[in-house]
C-alpha cells in the first residue's frame, strides 16, 4: 500500500470526496483516507502522479510519503514525527486570540448598550450609521482572519463537493450580506428621516452573528485539534525514544555518527543508561535491557553474547558491543510505528455507515437550510427571522463528528495496544478481534513454552537422583533430540561434569546406546529398556501415570541394571490456565490443536482448562480444522507463526504470539510481542472496548444532528416556542467534534489486563458442536506417492470422500499429501486400501 499526505481536508465530507476521486483513477483497487492523520493509503497499479492529480482536481493537495526501503531510520521516524506534529493548534490559537480581541468591541457595540445599558462613546450616541459601519469593519476583520473557512468552503462548493467549511462560510456570509443590506437600507431611511425604519433596520443587523460563528467554530476546531493530537501520544512517545546518534567502532576507535549513517554489519557500543540505536546482536558484554518501550514488559531482560537487542530499548547496567542487523525502516521500532500508522490509514467496516451519510450530509443540510428559509417566509415571518433559522441549520450541522467517530477511537485503541506489545495491523483486525466466538490455540509455543523441560526424576531402588542424572547426561550429550536438550539443560544447571562415552549409537524410534567406563549405558522408551533390563511393576505404574499427565517417560539402565526414569514434558506456561479461563468468562469457546496423541493432548488440555482438544493435527491439517470451526462461528487462530501461517490466514483473525522483535509476520492480523497467552484475552478486551467507544461516538454524532437540526430550523417554535440563535448553533457545532474526540481519549484509561469487568457474550455455539475429535483423531495426514497433476488430486479426493466417516479431503500433488477430516472412526487400513486401489502408493498416515 502506497502512503500519501493529504492537505486541505476539514471534515468527513472532504475525506469522502478524496476517496471517491482517487477510487475513480484507473488501476486503483482500494483507497482509504484518514481525516485524523491527513493521510491516504492506495493500492493498485496507478502511478503517484495520477493519484496526486486526482486529489488536486478534487480541490485538495497531496504528496507521496518517503520511499519505502530507505536506510535512514532517523529520516523515516522524522517523517512520522512531522506527520503527527500538531501544526494546526498554534495557528488556530493566533486566529482565535485575534478574533476574540475584535469580537469583544463588536459585541459591545452590537448588544452591550441595548441589553445591559452599557454607555457608548458620545460620538456614537444616536449615530446609527457610525454604529453600523464600526460593526461592518470589525466583522470584515474577523472574516479576513478566518478566511480559511471561506477559501476552503467555496472552493469545495465550486468542485461540487461541499464540506463543513462550506456550511460555516455560507452561514457567516449570509449573516454578513443581509446585515450589509440592512445597513444600506437603514442609511437610506436615515437620509429620508424615517426614524421608525432606522430603528427597525438596526435590529436586523447580524454582524455579530457572522463574526461569532467564525470565532466559535475556531474555538471548537482548536479544542478538536488539541484532542486529536493526544490520540497519537502513544506513537509520539515511541518516536521520542528513537536515538538520533550511535557510537560505532571503526579501526578500533569510537566514532559518534548520525543514526542514518549506521549500516547493517556495523559494530556499535552502548553504555549503561543509553538507548540502543538499532536492532542488533550482542558480541561482547552482559547487561539488563529494559524492553518496556516495545513490549510493555517492565522487568529488564538479561542479555549476553548472541542475544538480540532492539532499537529504542534501554541498556540499564552493562557495557555492550553489538553488531547491527536491522537499520532504518527495518528496525522493530520503525515497524511498530509503520504498523500503527497503517492501521490508522485503513477503514473499519463500522465506519462505512458514517462514510455513506457524510457523502450526502452537507448537500442535504444546505437543502434543509434553504427549505427552512422559504417555509418561514411563506409562514409570514420577516426575512431576518427566516434567515436566522436557515443560518442556524447551517452552523449547527456537523459532519466532522461523524467522520471522526471511528478513526479517533481506532487510533487511540491502536496506541494503547502498541504500548502493551499488541499490534493490530489494520482497523479491520481491531474491529473483528472483539467479535471472536471461538479461539483455536496451537499447543506448542502458545499454551506450552515450546521447550521441553525435565519434570520428574524417578531413580530405581538403590540409585540416587544424581547418579540417574549423571548417566542420562553422559548418554544424551551426543544427541540432538529436543528431549535430550531438556536433560542436558538440567544437568548443566546442577553443575554436573561431562563424562565421555564411546560406541555411541542412536536407535531411531527407540533410544540411545553407548558405553561408559566399559559398561553399556541405555536410554529410551519402554520397548528398548525392557530388552536391556528388568522394569519393576512400580516403575511401570509410575510411567503410566506420568503419560496420563502428558509427560514423556525416558528409561535408563547400565549393564542390565535399572538406573531409573526421567519424565520430560513441554510444560504449559504459567499464565495459560488463567488466560483460558478469562476467554471462557468472556463467553468464548477455547479449542486446542496439537499433533500429539490423544492421551498427551487431553492431559495438556485438562491442565490448561480448554473446552475441546483436537489431537493428531499436523501442520498441513490445521487449515482444514480452522475451516470446519469457522462453520460454527467467528474463529481466532493463535499460533507462534512458525508453521501456522496457513491456519492464521484461514481464520477470521490470525494472532501471532511471542513475535518478540520479529513483528513482520505476514500471515497474522494481530501480532503479540510477548509469549504471554494472557495477551490474547487482553487484545479481545481492547477490541471490544474500542468497538464500544466507536458505537458511543456514532450514537452521539447521529443523535446530535438528529436533535440539533430540527431545533435550529424552528420545528418546535409553534409548540414550545423553542428558538435557537445562530451563535448558540455555532457553539454547539464547535463542541460536537470535541466531545467525540474526548470520548475516544477515555480509552487511554482502559486497562487491557483487567478481567474484573469482562462481559460474557451470548455464544449460541453448543459445546458438543465443537467436539470434532474421535478415537482415531479428527484429522489424518496421508503421505502419497505417484500423484502428478490436478487430475490425480481430484481422483484421490473423490476416492477418500466416498469412504463412510470421511467428511472432506484436502489433496495436494505438490506436497504429496492428503489431509483427511473424519466425522467417525476410520482405520488407516481402509484409507490406505482405497488410495492404493487407484494405483497410488501410501507411504504413511499420521
Which sequence ranges carry the predicted segments?
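Membrane-embedded alpha-helical bundles of multi-pass transporters
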Residues: 115-129, 158, 177, 416, ...
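Conserved ATP-binding TGD loop and adjacent catalytic N/P-domain core of P-type ATPases
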Residues: 16, 346, 424, 436, ...
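ATP-driven catalytic headpiece of P-type ATPases
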Residues: 92-94, 313, 437-480, 510-591, ...
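Transmembrane helix-loop-helix hairpins at the membrane interface
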Residues: 91-245, 356, 721-726, 732
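Conserved catalytic phosphorylation-site environment of P-type ATPases
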Residues: 294, 353, 388, 401-475, ...
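Flexible metal-binding regulatory segments at protein termini and peripheral loops
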Residues: 1-130, 228, 253-254, 338-346, ...
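Conserved cytosolic catalytic loops of P-type ATPases
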Residues: 26-43, 204-205, 236-330, 428-472, ...
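Juxtamembrane coupling segments of multi-pass membrane pumps/enzymes
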Residues: 186, 194-197, 211-272, 303, ...
Amino acid at each position: 500500500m502506497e502512503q500519501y499526505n493529504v492537505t486541505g481536508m476539514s471534515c468527513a465530507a472532504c475525506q469522502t470526496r478524496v476517496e471517491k476521486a482517487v477510487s475513480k483513477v484507473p488501476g486503483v483497487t482500494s483507497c482509504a483516507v484518514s481525516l485524523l492523520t491527513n493521510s491516504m493509503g492506495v493500492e493498485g497499479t496507478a502511478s503517484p502522479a495520477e493519484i496526486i492529480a486526482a486529489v488536486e482536481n478534487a480541490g485538495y493537495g497531496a504528496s507521496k510519503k518517503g520511499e519505502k526501503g530507505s536506510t535512514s531510520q532517523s529520516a523515516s521516524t522524522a517523517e512520522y514525527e512531522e506527520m503527527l506534529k500538531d501544526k494546526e493548534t498554534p495557528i488556530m490559537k493566533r486566529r482565535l486570540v485575534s478574533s476574540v480581541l475584535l469580537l469583544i468591541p463588536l459585541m459591545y457595540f452590537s448588544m452591550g448598550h441595548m441589553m445591559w445599558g452599557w454607555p457608548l462613546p458620545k460620538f456614537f450616541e444616536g449615530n446609527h450609521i457610525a454604529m453600523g459601519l464600526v460593526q461592518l469593519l470589525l466583522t470584515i476583520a474577523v472574516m479576513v482572519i478566518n478566511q480559511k473557512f471561506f477559501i476552503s468552503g467555496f472552493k469545495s462548493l465550486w468542485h461540487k463537493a461541499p464540506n463543513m467549511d462550506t456550511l460555516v462560510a455560507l452561514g457567516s456570509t449570509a449573516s454578513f450580506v443581509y446585515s450589509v443590506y440592512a445597513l444600506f437600507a437603514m442609511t437610506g431611511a436615515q437620509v429620508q428621516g424615517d426614524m421608525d425604519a432606522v430603528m427597525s433596520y438596526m435590529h436586523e443587523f447580524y454582524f455579530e452573528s457572522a463574526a461569532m460563528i467564525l470565532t466559535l467554530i475556531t474555538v471548537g476546531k482548536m479544542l478538536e485539534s488539541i484532542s486529536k493530537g493526544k490520540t497519537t501520544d502513544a506513537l509520539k512517545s515511541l518516536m521520542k525514544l528513537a536515538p538520533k546518534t550511535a557510537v560505532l567502532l571503526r579501526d578500533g576507535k569510537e566514532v559518534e555518527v548520525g543514526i542514518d549513517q549506521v549500516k547493517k554489519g556495523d559494530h556499535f557500543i552502548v553504555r549503561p543508561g543509553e538507548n540502543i540505536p538499532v536492532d542488533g546482536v550482542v558480541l561482547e558484554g552482559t547487561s539488563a535491557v529494559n524492553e518496556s518501550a516495545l513490549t510493555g514488559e517492565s522487568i529488564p531482560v538479561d542479555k549476553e553474547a548472541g542475544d538480540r537487542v532492539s532499537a529504542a530499548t534501554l541498556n540499564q547496567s552493562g557495557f555492550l558491543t553489538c553488531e547491527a542487523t536491522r537499520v532504518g525502516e527495518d528496525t522493530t521500532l520503525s515497524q511498530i510505528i509503520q504498523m500503527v500508522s497503517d492501521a490508522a490509514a485503513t477503514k473499519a467496516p463500522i465506519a462505512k455507515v458514517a462514510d455513506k451519510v457524510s457523502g450526502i450530509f452537507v448537500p442535504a443540510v444546505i437543502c434543509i437550510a434553504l427549505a427552512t428559509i422559504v417555509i418561514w417566509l411563506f409562514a409570514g415571518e420577516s426575512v431576518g427571522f427566516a434567515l436566522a433559522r436557515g443560518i442556524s441549520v447551517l452552523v449547527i450541522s456537523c459532519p466532522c463528528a461523524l467522520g471522526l467517530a471511528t478513526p479517533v477511537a481506532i487510533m487511540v485503541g491502536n496506541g494503547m495496544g502498541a504500548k502493551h506489545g499488541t499490534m493490530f495491523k489494520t482497523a479491520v483486525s481491531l474491529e473483528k478481534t472483539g467479535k471472536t466466538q471461538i479461539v483455536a490455540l496451537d499447543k506448542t509455543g502458545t499454551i506450552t513454552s515450546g521447550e521441553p523441560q525435565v519434570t520428574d526424576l524417578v531413580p530405581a531402588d538403590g540409585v540416587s537422583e544424581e547418579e540417574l542424572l549423571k548417566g542420562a547426561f553422559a548418554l544424551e550429550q551426543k544427541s540432538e533430540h529436543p528431549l535430550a536438550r531438556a536433560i542436558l539443560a538440567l544437568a548443566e544447571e546442577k553443575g554436573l561434569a561431562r563424562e565421555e562415552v564411546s560406541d555411541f549409537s542412536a536407535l531411531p524410534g527407540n533410544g540411545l546406546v553407548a558405553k561408559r567406563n566399559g559398561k553399556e549405558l541405555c536410554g529410551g522408551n519402554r520397548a528398548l529398556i525392557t530388552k536391556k533390563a528388568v522394569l519393576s511393576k512400580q516403575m511401570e505404574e509410575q510411567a503410566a501415570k506420568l503419560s496420563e499427565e502428558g509427560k514423556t517417560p525416558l528409561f535408563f539402565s547400565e549393564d542390565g541394571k535399572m538406573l531409573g526414569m526421567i519424565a520430560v514434558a513441554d510444560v504449559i506456561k504459567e499464565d495459560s490456565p488463567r488466560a483460558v479461563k478469562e476467554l471462557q468468562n468472556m463467553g468464548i469457546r477455547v479449542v486446542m490443536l496439537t499433533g500429539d496423541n490423544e492421551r498427551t493432548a487431553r492431559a495438556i488440555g485438562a491442565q490448561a482448562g480448554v473446552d475441546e482438544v483436537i489431537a493428531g493435527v499436523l501442520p498441513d491439517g490445521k487449515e482444514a480444522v480452522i475451516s470446519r470451526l469457522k462453520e460454527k462461528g467467528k474463529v481466532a487462530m493463535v499460533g507462534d507463526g512458525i508453521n501456522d501461517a496457513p491456519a492464521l490466514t484461514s481464520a477470521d483473525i490470525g494472532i501471532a504470539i511471542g513475535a518478540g522483535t520479529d513483528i513482520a509476520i505476514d500471515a497474522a492480523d494481530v501480532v503479540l510481542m510477548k509469549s504471554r497467552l494472557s495477551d490474547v484475552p487482553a487484545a479481545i478486551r481492547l477490541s471490544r472496548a474500542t468497538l464500544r467507544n466507536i458505537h458511543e461516538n456514532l450514537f452521539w454524532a447521529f443523535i446530535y444532528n438528529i436533535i440539533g437540526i430540527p431545533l435550529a430550523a424552528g420545528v418546535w417554535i409553534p409548540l414550545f416556542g423553542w428558538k435557537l440563535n445562530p451563535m448558540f448553533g455555532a457553539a454547539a457545532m464547535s463542541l460536537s467534534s470535541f466531545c467525540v474526540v474526548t470520548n475516544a481519549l477515555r480509552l487511554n484509561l482502559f486497562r487491557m489486563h483487567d478481567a474484573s469487568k469482562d462481559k460474557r457474550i451470548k455464544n449460541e455455539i453448543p459445546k458438543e458442536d465443537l467436539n470434532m475429535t474421535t478415537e482415531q483423531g479428527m484429522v489424518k495426514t496421508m503421505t502419497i506417492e505417484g500423484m502428478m497433476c490436478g487430475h490425480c488430486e481430484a481422483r484421490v479426493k473423490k476416492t477418500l470422500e466416498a469412504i463412510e466417516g470421511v467428511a472432506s479431503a484436502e489433496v495436494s500433488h505438490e506436497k504429496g499429501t492428503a489431509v483427511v477430516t473424519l466425522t467417525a472412526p476410520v482405520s488407516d487400513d481402509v484409507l490406505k486400501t482405497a488410495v492404493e486401489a487407484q494405483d497410488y502408493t501410501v507411504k504413511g498416515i499420521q
